Amino acid sequence: MGKIQLGYWILVLFIVTWSDLGLCKKPKPRPGGGWNSGGSNRYPGQPGSPGGNRYPGWGHPQGGGTNWGQPHPGGSNWGQPHPGGSSWGQPHGGSNWGQGGYNKWKPDKPKTNLKHVAGAAAAGAVVGGLGGYMLGSAMSRPVIHFGNEYEDRYYRENQYRYPNQVMYRPIDQYSSQNNFVHDCVNITVKQHTTTTTTKGENFTETDIKIMERVVEQMCITQYQAEYEAAAQRAYNMAFFSAPPVTLLFLSFLIFLIVS
């Protein structure tokens, strides 16, 4: 008799527990398709495709210039002052919070430690002021062959100048892996070149070309890691959000075993 009562209590507890877990909403990550699927090259600067930079929308010298960050006719420059506009890393016009005759108290500016930022990267630390981008974990720079001896040697000798972390948004905000990688490369290279240029170091066209290839491989690695993590979370949620009929069947089996 005592064993039957124990079985009933276990059955009730099991049903209540699984009912609560069944209310959880299953996430629906939207990972994209395979890399370079569809048979076409999405980035026209790769070997075997027409020459040129694969991410031409920013930072590349126009009119035959060689150094990144120099003024371009008719365009804007990262890290350079723009008439009537604002620049990365440059003072912006307008009013500042905490100044003027209304607020006497001014909070201290927080100190940012880059080591702390890198340490939080594994948890997907959100980078402030960059529209919700996260900083990925530090990676070893990939081994890449560029198809000619000069660029291979240049990369080996200068790879320390290139980033070892990427910036990205969650993969469920992109329709495909290609879109994720393209955005990841753009924001990572922009941020790195802007930060480095403000320290007085410029980048040549060769630097930009090599950096894009390196960061692209790192962004692919980051996407794969995010995709696997999202798939694991979806699997766990699917298990705990099983249909009520399945839960009742499992509860009945446990009741029979206990009884």
From Swiss-Prot:
S-S bridge residues: 184-219
Q: Where in the cell is it found?
A: Cell membrane; Golgi apparatus
Q: From the UniProt entry, list the residue stretches annotated as the region Disordered.
A: 29-110
* Major localization listed first in the record, in broad terms: membrane
What the entry lists under SUPFAM superfamilies is as follows: Prion-like (SSF54098)
- Name the keywords, alphabetized: Amyloid, Cell membrane, Copper, Disulfide bond, Glycoprotein, Golgi apparatus, GPI-anchor, Lipoprotein, Membrane, Metal-binding, Prion, Repeat, Signal
Region Interaction with GRB2, ERI3 and SYN1, annotated ranges: 25-235
**Residues annotated as binding Cu(2+) 2:** 72, 74
InterPro entries to which the protein is assigned, alphabetical: Prion (IPR000817), Prion/Doppel_b-ribbon_dom_sf (IPR036924), Prion/Doppel_prot_b-ribbon_dom (IPR022416), Prion_N (IPR025860)
Q: Which residues form the signal peptide?
A: 1-24
Its placement in the membrane is given as: Lipid-anchor; GPI-anchor
GO terms of biological process kind: protein homooligomerization
Q: Where is the composition biased (Gly residues)?
A: 91-101
Q: GO CC: one term?
A: plasma membrane
Q: Which residues are glycosylated?
A: 186, 202
Q: Where does Cu(2+) 3 bind?
A: 82, 84
Lipidation feature positions (GPI-anchor amidated asparagine): 236
Q: What does the sequence similarity comment in the record state about its family?
A: Belongs to the prion family.
Quaternary structure (record): Monomer and homodimer. Has a tendency to aggregate into amyloid fibrils containing a cross-beta spine, formed by a steric zipper of superposed beta-strands. Soluble oligomers may represent an intermediate stage on the path to fibril formation. Copper binding may promote oligomerization. Interacts with GRB2, APP, ERI3/PRNPIP and SYN1. Mislocalized cytosolically exposed PrP interacts with MGRN1; this interaction alters MGRN1 subcellular location and causes lysosomal enlargement. Interacts with KIAA1191.
Q: What is this protein called?
A: Major prion protein
Q: What organism is the protein native to?
A: Trichosurus vulpecula
